[in-house]
Protein backbone atom coordinates (compact mmCIF):
# COMPACT_ATOMS: atom_id res chain seq x y z
CA UNK A 1 0.00 0.00 0.00
CA UNK A 2 3.03 2.27 0.28
CA UNK A 3 3.32 2.21 -3.52
CA UNK A 4 -0.39 2.86 -4.03
CA UNK A 5 -0.19 5.83 -1.68
CA UNK A 6 2.88 7.09 -3.55
CA UNK A 7 0.98 7.29 -6.83
CA UNK A 8 -2.20 8.72 -5.32
CA UNK A 9 -0.35 11.59 -3.58
CA UNK A 10 1.51 12.63 -6.74
CA UNK A 11 4.60 13.19 -4.61
CA UNK A 12 7.68 14.41 -6.51
CA UNK A 13 9.99 12.73 -4.01
CA UNK A 14 11.35 9.37 -5.29
CA UNK A 15 10.06 6.19 -3.69
CA UNK A 16 13.09 4.36 -2.26
CA UNK A 17 13.01 0.56 -2.14
CA UNK A 18 15.87 -1.48 -0.67
CA UNK A 19 16.48 -5.23 -0.69
CA UNK A 20 19.27 -7.80 -0.52
CA UNK A 21 19.91 -7.07 -4.19
CA UNK A 22 18.63 -4.74 -6.87
CA UNK A 23 17.37 -7.77 -8.79
CA UNK A 24 15.18 -8.73 -5.85
CA UNK A 25 13.74 -5.21 -5.63
CA UNK A 26 13.01 -5.16 -9.38
CA UNK A 27 11.29 -8.55 -9.14
CA UNK A 28 9.21 -7.16 -6.27
CA UNK A 29 8.13 -4.21 -8.43
CA UNK A 30 7.16 -6.54 -11.26
CA UNK A 31 4.85 -8.44 -8.91
CA UNK A 32 3.45 -5.23 -7.43
CA UNK A 33 2.45 -3.82 -10.81
CA UNK A 34 0.59 -7.04 -11.59
CA UNK A 35 -1.86 -6.22 -8.78
CA UNK A 36 -5.17 -5.13 -10.43
CA UNK A 37 -5.27 -1.82 -8.54
CA UNK A 38 -1.85 -0.85 -9.93
CA UNK A 39 -2.09 -2.30 -13.44
CA UNK A 40 -2.93 1.15 -14.78
CA UNK A 41 0.63 2.28 -14.03
CA UNK A 42 2.44 -0.79 -15.35
CA UNK A 43 2.68 0.23 -19.02
CA UNK A 44 4.18 3.59 -18.04
CA UNK A 45 7.10 2.08 -16.10
CA UNK A 46 10.57 2.30 -17.67
CA UNK A 47 13.58 0.65 -16.04
CA UNK A 48 16.82 2.44 -16.93
CA UNK A 49 20.03 0.41 -17.02
CA UNK A 50 22.24 2.91 -18.85
CA UNK A 51 22.86 6.64 -18.78
CA UNK A 52 22.10 9.28 -21.46
CA UNK A 53 18.75 7.71 -22.31
CA UNK A 54 16.63 9.25 -19.54
CA UNK A 55 17.32 12.92 -20.53
CA UNK A 56 16.41 12.26 -24.17
CA UNK A 57 13.06 10.71 -23.30
CA UNK A 58 12.32 13.37 -20.65
CA UNK A 59 12.70 16.11 -23.30
CA UNK A 60 9.91 14.52 -25.34
CA UNK A 61 7.50 13.45 -22.59
CA UNK A 62 7.15 13.22 -18.84
CA UNK A 63 4.27 10.76 -18.85
CA UNK A 64 6.29 7.79 -17.64
CA UNK A 65 7.59 6.37 -14.37
CA UNK A 66 11.34 6.05 -13.89
CA UNK A 67 12.87 3.08 -12.10
CA UNK A 68 16.55 3.74 -11.35
CA UNK A 69 18.72 0.94 -10.00
CA UNK A 70 22.24 2.27 -10.61
CA UNK A 71 23.94 5.27 -9.04
CA UNK A 72 24.72 6.71 -12.45
CA UNK A 73 21.08 6.70 -13.52
CA UNK A 74 20.07 8.00 -10.09
CA UNK A 75 22.40 11.00 -10.51
CA UNK A 76 21.03 11.61 -14.00
CA UNK A 77 17.51 11.55 -12.56
CA UNK A 78 18.19 14.39 -10.10
CA UNK A 79 17.34 17.36 -12.43
CA UNK A 80 14.05 15.71 -13.46
CA UNK A 81 12.77 14.66 -10.02
CA UNK A 82 10.12 17.37 -9.85
CA UNK A 83 8.81 16.51 -13.33
CA UNK A 84 8.92 12.71 -13.22
CA UNK A 85 7.50 10.08 -10.93
CA UNK A 86 10.47 7.94 -9.90
CA UNK A 87 11.34 4.83 -7.94
CA UNK A 88 14.90 4.24 -6.75
CA UNK A 89 16.04 0.74 -5.80
CA UNK A 90 19.30 -0.10 -4.08
CA UNK A 91 20.99 -2.73 -1.88
CA UNK A 92 19.66 -2.54 1.68
CA UNK A 93 23.00 -1.86 3.36
CA UNK A 94 24.05 0.71 0.76
CA UNK A 95 21.00 2.97 1.02
CA UNK A 96 22.06 6.61 1.38
CA UNK A 97 18.64 7.94 2.37
CA UNK A 98 15.81 6.56 4.48
CA UNK A 99 14.04 3.74 2.67
CA UNK A 100 10.29 3.88 2.11
CA UNK A 101 10.09 0.11 1.61
CA UNK A 102 12.61 -2.39 3.00
CA UNK A 103 12.43 -5.96 1.70
CA UNK A 104 13.71 -8.04 4.59
CA UNK A 105 14.45 -11.78 4.30
CA UNK A 106 11.27 -13.78 4.76
CA UNK A 107 10.35 -15.25 8.11
CA UNK A 108 10.33 -19.02 8.49
CA UNK A 109 6.59 -19.51 8.06
CA UNK A 110 6.07 -17.28 4.96
CA UNK A 111 9.20 -18.82 3.39
CA UNK A 112 7.91 -22.35 3.90
CA UNK A 113 4.38 -21.56 2.75
CA UNK A 114 5.71 -19.94 -0.43
CA UNK A 115 7.83 -22.99 -1.27
CA UNK A 116 4.94 -25.32 -0.44
CA UNK A 117 2.84 -23.43 -2.98
CA UNK A 118 5.63 -24.18 -5.51
CA UNK A 119 5.22 -27.89 -4.81
CA UNK A 120 8.37 -28.28 -2.71
CA UNK A 121 8.49 -31.08 -0.15
CA UNK A 122 9.30 -30.72 3.53
CA UNK A 123 12.88 -31.85 2.89
CA UNK A 124 13.26 -29.55 -0.13
CA UNK A 125 12.17 -26.62 2.01
CA UNK A 126 14.55 -27.50 4.86
CA UNK A 127 17.50 -27.75 2.46
CA UNK A 128 16.68 -24.51 0.65
CA UNK A 129 16.06 -22.63 3.90
CA UNK A 130 19.47 -23.65 5.21
CA UNK A 131 21.26 -23.03 1.92
CA UNK A 132 19.70 -19.61 1.28
CA UNK A 133 19.37 -18.15 4.76
CA UNK A 134 15.83 -17.27 3.54
CA UNK A 135 17.32 -14.59 1.28
CA UNK A 136 15.28 -14.55 -1.93
CA UNK A 137 18.33 -13.44 -3.91
CA UNK A 138 20.33 -16.45 -2.73
CA UNK A 139 17.30 -18.71 -3.15
CA UNK A 140 17.14 -17.72 -6.81
CA UNK A 141 20.72 -18.91 -7.24
CA UNK A 142 20.00 -22.16 -5.43
CA UNK A 143 17.04 -22.89 -7.71
CA UNK A 144 18.74 -21.86 -10.95
CA UNK A 145 20.42 -24.27 -13.37
CA UNK A 146 22.09 -21.41 -15.25
CA UNK A 147 25.78 -21.03 -14.20
CA UNK A 148 25.72 -17.25 -14.68
CA UNK A 149 22.85 -16.93 -12.22
CA UNK A 150 24.14 -19.63 -9.85
CA UNK A 151 27.32 -17.67 -9.08
CA UNK A 152 27.07 -14.33 -7.22
CA UNK A 153 28.36 -11.27 -9.02
CA UNK A 154 30.80 -10.39 -6.22
CA UNK A 155 32.63 -13.70 -6.71
CA UNK A 156 34.08 -12.39 -9.99
CA UNK A 157 36.20 -9.93 -7.99
CA UNK A 158 39.22 -11.88 -6.71
CA UNK A 159 39.90 -9.33 -3.96
CA UNK A 160 36.38 -9.62 -2.58
CA UNK A 161 36.51 -13.41 -2.83
CA UNK A 162 39.79 -13.44 -0.87
CA UNK A 163 38.33 -11.13 1.79
CA UNK A 164 35.42 -13.53 2.16
CA UNK A 165 37.53 -16.63 2.90
CA UNK A 166 37.97 -16.17 6.69
CA UNK A 167 34.38 -14.95 7.08
CA UNK A 168 32.95 -17.98 5.32
CA UNK A 169 35.08 -20.37 7.36
CA UNK A 170 33.95 -18.73 10.62
CA UNK A 171 30.28 -18.43 9.62
CA UNK A 172 28.91 -16.30 12.48
CA UNK A 173 30.57 -14.51 15.40
CA UNK A 174 30.10 -11.88 18.09
CA UNK A 175 31.98 -8.68 17.24
CA UNK A 176 31.95 -7.62 20.92
CA UNK A 177 33.43 -10.89 22.15
CA UNK A 178 37.19 -10.46 22.58
CA UNK A 179 37.95 -14.15 22.00
CA UNK A 180 35.88 -14.16 18.80
CA UNK A 181 37.63 -11.01 17.58
CA UNK A 182 41.06 -12.51 18.23
CA UNK A 183 40.18 -15.72 16.46
CA UNK A 184 38.79 -13.90 13.40
CA UNK A 185 41.97 -11.83 13.25
CA UNK A 186 44.06 -15.01 13.27
CA UNK A 187 41.89 -16.62 10.64
CA UNK A 188 42.13 -13.53 8.40
CA UNK A 189 45.83 -12.96 9.18
CA UNK A 190 45.30 -9.31 10.11
CA UNK A 191 47.01 -7.47 12.95
CA UNK A 192 43.78 -5.96 14.28
CA UNK A 193 40.13 -6.96 14.20
CA UNK A 194 39.27 -3.35 13.30
CA UNK A 195 40.89 -3.91 9.90
CA UNK A 196 38.60 -6.87 9.35
CA UNK A 197 35.58 -4.86 10.48
CA UNK A 198 36.35 -2.26 7.79
CA UNK A 199 36.37 -5.01 5.18
CA UNK A 200 32.99 -6.18 6.45
CA UNK A 201 31.57 -2.65 6.19
CA UNK A 202 32.71 -2.51 2.57
CA UNK A 203 31.18 -5.91 1.85
CA UNK A 204 27.88 -4.75 3.33
CA UNK A 205 27.67 -2.02 0.67
CA UNK A 206 27.75 -4.51 -2.19
CA UNK A 207 24.74 -5.38 -4.26
CA UNK A 208 23.75 -8.91 -3.20
CA UNK A 209 26.02 -8.59 -0.16
CA UNK A 210 27.20 -12.00 1.11
CA UNK A 211 27.42 -10.85 4.74
CA UNK A 212 25.03 -9.51 7.36
CA UNK A 213 25.36 -7.41 10.49
CA UNK A 214 22.83 -7.25 13.31
CA UNK A 215 23.79 -5.58 16.57
CA UNK A 216 26.95 -7.27 17.84
CA UNK A 217 26.60 -10.25 15.54
CA UNK A 218 28.23 -10.66 12.14
CA UNK A 219 27.85 -13.50 9.70
CA UNK A 220 27.61 -14.90 6.20
CA UNK A 221 24.12 -15.01 4.68
CA UNK A 222 24.58 -18.41 3.03
CA UNK A 223 27.65 -20.41 3.96
CA UNK A 224 27.08 -23.05 1.28
CA UNK A 225 26.45 -20.46 -1.42
CA UNK A 226 29.57 -18.53 -0.41
CA UNK A 227 31.97 -21.47 0.01
CA UNK A 228 31.24 -22.65 -3.53
CA UNK A 229 31.68 -19.09 -4.82
CA UNK A 230 35.12 -18.60 -3.20
CA UNK A 231 36.56 -22.07 -3.82
CA UNK A 232 39.18 -20.69 -6.23
CA UNK A 233 40.42 -18.18 -3.62
CA UNK A 234 40.89 -20.66 -0.76
CA UNK A 235 44.46 -21.84 -0.18
CA UNK A 236 45.68 -24.98 1.55
CA UNK A 237 47.10 -22.76 4.29
CA UNK A 238 43.63 -21.24 4.83
CA UNK A 239 42.12 -24.68 5.32
CA UNK A 240 44.73 -25.99 7.73
CA UNK A 241 44.68 -22.72 9.66
CA UNK A 242 40.93 -23.19 10.04
CA UNK A 243 41.39 -26.77 11.29
CA UNK A 244 43.84 -25.59 13.96
CA UNK A 245 41.43 -22.88 15.07
CA UNK A 246 38.48 -25.31 15.02
CA UNK A 247 40.28 -27.53 17.48
CA UNK A 248 40.90 -24.56 19.78
CA UNK A 249 37.32 -23.28 19.68
CA UNK A 250 35.51 -26.61 19.86
CA UNK A 251 37.96 -28.02 22.38
CA UNK A 252 37.07 -25.38 24.97
CA UNK A 253 35.54 -26.88 28.10
CA UNK A 254 32.22 -25.61 29.48
CA UNK A 255 32.86 -24.02 32.92
CA UNK A 256 29.12 -24.17 33.66
CA UNK A 257 29.57 -27.89 34.33
CA UNK A 258 31.47 -26.96 37.50
CA UNK A 259 28.19 -25.77 39.00
CA UNK A 260 25.43 -27.97 40.45
CA UNK A 261 22.85 -28.81 37.77
CA UNK A 262 20.20 -26.62 39.42
CA UNK A 263 22.44 -23.55 39.08
CA UNK A 264 23.82 -24.02 35.56
CA UNK A 265 21.11 -21.90 33.98
CA UNK A 266 22.67 -18.90 35.77
CA UNK A 267 26.26 -19.77 34.80
CA UNK A 268 26.80 -16.28 33.40
CA UNK A 269 26.04 -14.72 36.78
CA UNK A 270 28.75 -16.87 38.35
CA UNK A 271 31.27 -16.03 35.62
CA UNK A 272 31.15 -19.63 34.45
CA UNK A 273 30.86 -19.16 30.71
CA UNK A 274 33.00 -19.95 27.71
CA UNK A 275 35.37 -17.44 26.17
CA UNK A 276 34.19 -18.13 22.62
CA UNK A 277 30.58 -17.35 21.76
CA UNK A 278 28.01 -20.05 21.08
CA UNK A 279 27.33 -18.71 17.58
CA UNK A 280 31.01 -19.04 16.67
CA UNK A 281 31.10 -22.64 17.95
CA UNK A 282 28.11 -23.48 15.78
CA UNK A 283 29.58 -21.70 12.77
CA UNK A 284 32.90 -23.56 13.10
CA UNK A 285 31.08 -26.90 13.53
CA UNK A 286 28.99 -26.28 10.41
CA UNK A 287 32.09 -25.43 8.37
CA UNK A 288 33.64 -28.70 9.53
CA UNK A 289 30.59 -30.53 8.15
CA UNK A 290 30.71 -28.63 4.85
CA UNK A 291 34.39 -29.46 4.41
CA UNK A 292 33.67 -33.11 5.17
CA UNK A 293 30.79 -33.26 2.68
CA UNK A 294 32.10 -31.01 -0.12
CA UNK A 295 35.79 -30.55 0.68
CA UNK A 296 37.09 -33.20 -1.71
CA UNK A 297 35.02 -31.86 -4.62
CA UNK A 298 35.92 -28.24 -3.89
CA UNK A 299 39.58 -28.53 -2.92
CA UNK A 300 40.67 -32.13 -3.50
CA UNK A 301 41.90 -31.87 -7.06
CA UNK A 302 43.94 -28.65 -6.93
CA UNK A 303 44.86 -28.62 -3.23
CA UNK A 304 44.94 -32.32 -2.38
CA UNK A 305 42.62 -31.66 0.57
CA UNK A 306 40.45 -34.46 1.96
CA UNK A 307 37.82 -32.78 4.13
CA UNK A 308 36.26 -36.03 5.30
CA UNK A 309 39.58 -37.35 6.58
CA UNK A 310 40.47 -34.08 8.33
CA UNK A 311 37.02 -33.80 9.94
CA UNK A 312 37.35 -37.32 11.33
CA UNK A 313 40.72 -36.39 12.85
CA UNK A 314 39.25 -33.32 14.51
CA UNK A 315 36.28 -35.24 15.95
CA UNK A 316 38.57 -37.89 17.40
CA UNK A 317 40.85 -35.26 18.93
CA UNK A 318 37.87 -33.44 20.44
CA UNK A 319 36.22 -36.47 22.04
CA UNK A 320 39.03 -38.91 22.81
CA UNK A 321 39.63 -40.05 25.45
CA UNK A 322 35.88 -39.98 25.95
CA UNK A 323 34.44 -38.71 29.23
CA UNK A 324 30.92 -37.86 30.35
CA UNK A 325 32.03 -34.27 30.87
CA UNK A 326 33.29 -33.98 27.28
CA UNK A 327 29.97 -35.27 26.01
CA UNK A 328 28.07 -32.76 28.13
CA UNK A 329 30.40 -29.90 27.18
CA UNK A 330 29.78 -30.68 23.50
CA UNK A 331 26.10 -31.55 23.91
CA UNK A 332 24.82 -29.07 21.32
CA UNK A 333 27.66 -29.82 18.91
CA UNK A 334 27.41 -33.63 18.89
CA UNK A 335 24.88 -33.78 16.00
CA UNK A 336 27.26 -31.75 13.83
CA UNK A 337 30.27 -33.84 14.89
CA UNK A 338 28.35 -36.97 13.89
CA UNK A 339 27.41 -35.39 10.57
CA UNK A 340 31.02 -34.36 9.93
CA UNK A 341 32.52 -37.77 10.71
CA UNK A 342 29.84 -40.50 10.94
CA UNK A 343 32.14 -43.53 11.10
CA UNK A 344 34.60 -41.96 13.53
CA UNK A 345 31.77 -40.80 15.79
CA UNK A 346 30.12 -44.23 15.89
CA UNK A 347 33.48 -45.90 16.54
CA UNK A 348 34.00 -43.71 19.60
CA UNK A 349 30.54 -44.45 21.03
CA UNK A 350 30.75 -48.19 20.31
CA UNK A 351 34.18 -48.56 21.90
CA UNK A 352 32.99 -46.78 25.02
CA UNK A 353 29.87 -48.95 25.36
CA UNK A 354 32.04 -52.07 25.15
CA UNK A 355 34.16 -50.93 28.09
CA UNK A 356 33.49 -51.87 31.71
CA UNK A 357 33.01 -48.24 32.78
CA UNK A 358 31.07 -46.56 29.99
CA UNK A 359 31.18 -42.76 29.99
CA UNK A 360 28.23 -42.55 27.59
CA UNK A 361 25.94 -44.19 30.13
CA UNK A 362 26.70 -41.29 32.47
CA UNK A 363 24.44 -39.14 30.27
CA UNK A 364 21.45 -41.37 31.01
CA UNK A 365 20.92 -40.17 34.55
CA UNK A 366 17.44 -38.82 35.39
CA UNK A 367 17.00 -35.09 34.78
CA UNK A 368 15.44 -32.92 37.48
CA UNK A 369 12.19 -31.02 37.03
CA UNK A 370 13.47 -27.67 38.24
CA UNK A 371 13.02 -24.58 36.10
CA UNK A 372 15.45 -24.15 33.17
CA UNK A 373 16.73 -27.72 33.53
CA UNK A 374 18.44 -29.12 30.43
CA UNK A 375 18.72 -32.69 29.20
CA UNK A 376 22.36 -33.86 28.87
CA UNK A 377 21.49 -36.75 26.53
CA UNK A 378 19.66 -34.71 23.87
CA UNK A 379 22.74 -33.96 21.77
CA UNK A 380 23.82 -37.60 21.67
CA UNK A 381 20.33 -38.81 20.75
CA UNK A 382 20.03 -36.24 17.96
CA UNK A 383 23.44 -37.28 16.67
CA UNK A 384 22.35 -40.91 16.55
CA UNK A 385 19.01 -40.01 14.97
CA UNK A 386 20.88 -38.09 12.26
CA UNK A 387 23.06 -41.10 11.45
CA UNK A 388 20.10 -43.50 11.40
CA UNK A 389 18.86 -41.96 8.14
CA UNK A 390 21.76 -43.42 6.16
CA UNK A 391 21.28 -47.16 5.42
CA UNK A 392 25.04 -47.71 5.82
CA UNK A 393 25.15 -46.44 9.41
CA UNK A 394 21.58 -47.44 10.30
CA UNK A 395 22.38 -50.92 11.77
CA UNK A 396 25.12 -49.54 14.00
CA UNK A 397 22.85 -46.80 15.32
CA UNK A 398 20.07 -49.29 16.09
CA UNK A 399 22.52 -51.46 18.02
CA UNK A 400 23.81 -48.48 20.03
CA UNK A 401 20.30 -47.26 20.83
CA UNK A 402 19.37 -50.81 21.80
CA UNK A 403 22.17 -50.83 24.36
CA UNK A 404 21.24 -47.37 25.67
CA UNK A 405 17.56 -48.36 25.91
CA UNK A 406 18.47 -51.08 28.40
CA UNK A 407 19.05 -48.32 30.95
CA UNK A 408 15.83 -47.28 32.68
CA UNK A 409 15.57 -43.48 32.93
CA UNK A 410 13.00 -42.26 35.43
CA UNK A 411 12.28 -38.67 34.42
CA UNK A 412 9.57 -36.86 32.48
CA UNK A 413 11.68 -35.97 29.42
CA UNK A 414 10.55 -37.44 26.10
CA UNK A 415 14.14 -37.52 24.83
CA UNK A 416 15.06 -41.08 25.69
CA UNK A 417 16.97 -43.72 23.69
CA UNK A 418 13.93 -45.99 23.41
CA UNK A 419 11.78 -43.17 22.00
CA UNK A 420 14.41 -42.44 19.34
CA UNK A 421 14.69 -46.14 18.52
CA UNK A 422 10.91 -46.64 18.30
CA UNK A 423 10.60 -43.62 16.04
CA UNK A 424 13.33 -44.87 13.70
CA UNK A 425 11.61 -48.26 13.35
CA UNK A 426 7.99 -47.06 13.37
CA UNK A 427 6.11 -49.19 10.84
CA UNK A 428 3.91 -46.43 9.44
CA UNK A 429 6.37 -43.53 9.66
CA UNK A 430 9.97 -44.85 9.76
CA UNK A 431 12.58 -42.17 10.45
CA UNK A 432 15.22 -43.75 8.23
CA UNK A 433 15.97 -44.30 4.55
CA UNK A 434 16.59 -48.00 5.26
CA UNK A 435 14.05 -50.19 3.47
CA UNK A 436 11.60 -52.59 5.11
CA UNK A 437 13.93 -55.57 4.81
CA UNK A 438 16.72 -53.72 6.59
CA UNK A 439 14.37 -52.52 9.31
CA UNK A 440 13.11 -56.05 9.97
CA UNK A 441 16.69 -57.35 10.15
CA UNK A 442 17.46 -54.58 12.63
CA UNK A 443 14.56 -55.63 14.87
CA UNK A 444 15.73 -59.25 14.71
CA UNK A 445 19.18 -58.08 15.72
CA UNK A 446 17.67 -56.25 18.69
CA UNK A 447 15.76 -59.35 19.74
CA UNK A 448 19.01 -61.29 19.61
CA UNK A 449 21.38 -58.80 21.29
CA UNK A 450 18.97 -56.76 23.40
CA UNK A 451 15.90 -59.03 23.74
CA UNK A 452 13.96 -56.92 26.25
CA UNK A 453 14.38 -53.80 24.13
CA UNK A 454 13.60 -55.67 20.91
CA UNK A 455 10.39 -57.03 22.44
CA UNK A 456 9.32 -53.54 23.51
CA UNK A 457 10.01 -52.21 20.01
CA UNK A 458 7.79 -54.89 18.46
CA UNK A 459 4.96 -54.17 20.90
CA UNK A 460 5.29 -50.43 20.24
CA UNK A 461 4.44 -51.05 16.58
CA UNK A 462 1.26 -52.97 17.48
CA UNK A 463 -0.95 -49.98 18.26
CA UNK A 464 -4.53 -48.98 17.56
CA UNK A 465 -4.78 -46.92 14.38
CA UNK A 466 -6.63 -44.19 16.22
CA UNK A 467 -3.97 -43.76 18.90
CA UNK A 468 -0.89 -43.67 16.70
CA UNK A 469 1.32 -40.64 17.18
CA UNK A 470 4.49 -40.07 15.17
CA UNK A 471 7.24 -37.50 15.38
CA UNK A 472 9.96 -36.33 13.06
CA UNK A 473 13.47 -37.24 14.15
CA UNK A 474 16.49 -34.98 13.84
CA UNK A 475 17.85 -34.84 10.28
CA UNK A 476 21.35 -33.89 9.09
CA UNK A 477 21.66 -30.19 8.26
CA UNK A 478 24.13 -30.46 5.39
CA UNK A 479 24.19 -34.09 4.25
CA UNK A 480 21.31 -35.35 2.14
CA UNK A 481 20.94 -38.55 4.16
CA UNK A 482 17.24 -39.24 4.59
CA UNK A 483 16.30 -36.70 1.93
CA UNK A 484 12.79 -37.54 0.79
CA UNK A 485 12.16 -39.94 3.68
CA UNK A 486 10.45 -39.67 7.05
CA UNK A 487 6.90 -38.79 6.03
CA UNK A 488 4.01 -41.13 6.94
CA UNK A 489 3.75 -44.01 4.47
CA UNK A 490 0.87 -43.45 2.08
CA UNK A 491 0.46 -47.09 1.00
CA UNK A 492 -1.46 -49.30 3.42
CA UNK A 493 0.09 -52.42 1.88
CA UNK A 494 3.57 -51.34 3.04
CA UNK A 495 2.35 -50.53 6.53
CA UNK A 496 0.44 -53.81 6.78
CA UNK A 497 3.47 -55.80 5.57
CA UNK A 498 5.67 -54.22 8.26
CA UNK A 499 3.02 -54.83 10.93
CA UNK A 500 2.78 -58.49 9.94
CA UNK A 501 6.55 -58.82 10.31
CA UNK A 502 6.38 -57.42 13.85
CA UNK A 503 3.46 -59.68 14.79
CA UNK A 504 5.25 -62.75 13.45
CA UNK A 505 8.32 -61.88 15.48
CA UNK A 506 6.37 -61.65 18.75
CA UNK A 507 4.37 -64.83 18.07
CA UNK A 508 7.34 -67.01 17.16
CA UNK A 509 9.68 -66.60 20.12
CA UNK A 510 11.41 -69.72 21.42
CA UNK A 511 10.44 -68.98 25.01
CA UNK A 512 8.11 -66.61 26.80
CA UNK A 513 8.18 -65.10 30.28
CA UNK A 514 5.00 -64.36 32.24
CA UNK A 515 5.56 -60.65 31.53
CA UNK A 516 5.75 -61.32 27.77
CA UNK A 517 2.53 -63.33 27.89
CA UNK A 518 0.81 -60.51 29.76
CA UNK A 519 2.00 -58.14 27.02
CA UNK A 520 0.46 -60.40 24.37
CA UNK A 521 -2.84 -60.47 26.24
CA UNK A 522 -2.86 -56.65 26.37
CA UNK A 523 -2.44 -56.59 22.57
CA UNK A 524 -5.22 -59.06 21.75
CA UNK A 525 -7.58 -56.28 20.67
CA UNK A 526 -5.29 -55.22 17.79
CA UNK A 527 -4.82 -58.78 16.48
CA UNK A 528 -6.98 -60.59 13.95
CA UNK A 529 -8.87 -63.70 15.08
CA UNK A 530 -6.26 -66.15 13.78
CA UNK A 531 -3.47 -64.35 15.65
CA UNK A 532 -5.57 -64.25 18.82
CA UNK A 533 -5.94 -68.02 18.63
CA UNK A 534 -2.17 -68.31 18.27
CA UNK A 535 -1.74 -66.28 21.47
CA UNK A 536 -4.08 -68.61 23.37
CA UNK A 537 -2.13 -71.59 22.01
CA UNK A 538 1.16 -70.04 23.19
CA UNK A 539 -0.26 -69.49 26.68
CA UNK A 540 -1.66 -73.02 26.86
CA UNK A 541 1.64 -74.58 25.72
CA UNK A 542 3.46 -72.50 28.31
CA UNK A 543 1.06 -73.62 31.05
CA UNK A 544 1.33 -77.33 30.35
CA UNK A 545 5.12 -77.11 30.05
CA UNK A 546 5.33 -76.79 33.82
CA UNK A 547 5.00 -73.08 34.54
CA UNK A 548 5.03 -72.20 38.28
CA UNK A 549 1.62 -71.61 39.88
CA UNK A 550 2.49 -68.02 40.82
CA UNK A 551 3.33 -67.20 37.20
CA UNK A 552 0.14 -68.85 36.01
CA UNK A 553 -1.80 -66.79 38.53
CA UNK A 554 -0.19 -63.60 37.22
CA UNK A 555 -1.15 -64.38 33.62
CA UNK A 556 -4.66 -65.48 34.65
CA UNK A 557 -5.20 -62.16 36.44
CA UNK A 558 -4.06 -60.25 33.36
CA UNK A 559 -6.54 -62.21 31.24
CA UNK A 560 -9.34 -61.50 33.72
CA UNK A 561 -8.66 -57.75 33.62
CA UNK A 562 -7.90 -57.31 29.92
CA UNK A 563 -10.29 -59.67 28.15
What are these regions (language model features)?
Residues 2-14, 19-56, 60, 71-76, ...:
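Non-catalytic all-alpha helical scaffold/repeat segments
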Residues 63-66:
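Conserved two-lobed SF2 helicase motor
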Residues 93-103:
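Short regulatory helix/loop adjacent to the ATP-binding pocket of P-loop NTPases
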Amino acid sequence: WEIKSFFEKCDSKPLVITADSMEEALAFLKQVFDIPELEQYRDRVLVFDKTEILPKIAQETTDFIVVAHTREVERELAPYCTMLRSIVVSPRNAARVKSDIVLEPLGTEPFRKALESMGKSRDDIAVLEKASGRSLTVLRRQLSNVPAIGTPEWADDSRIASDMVPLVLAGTWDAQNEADRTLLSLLAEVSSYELLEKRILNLLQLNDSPVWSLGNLRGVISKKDAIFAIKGSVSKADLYRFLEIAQIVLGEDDPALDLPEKERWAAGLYGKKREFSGVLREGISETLVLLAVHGKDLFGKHLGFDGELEAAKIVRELLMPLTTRKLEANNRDLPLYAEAAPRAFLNIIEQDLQSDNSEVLGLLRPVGTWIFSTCPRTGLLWALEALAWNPHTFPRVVNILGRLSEVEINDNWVNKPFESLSSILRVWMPQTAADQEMRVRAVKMLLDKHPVVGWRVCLKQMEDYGTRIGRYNYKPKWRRDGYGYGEPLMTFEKIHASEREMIELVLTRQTYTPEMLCDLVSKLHVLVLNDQERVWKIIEDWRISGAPDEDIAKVREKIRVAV
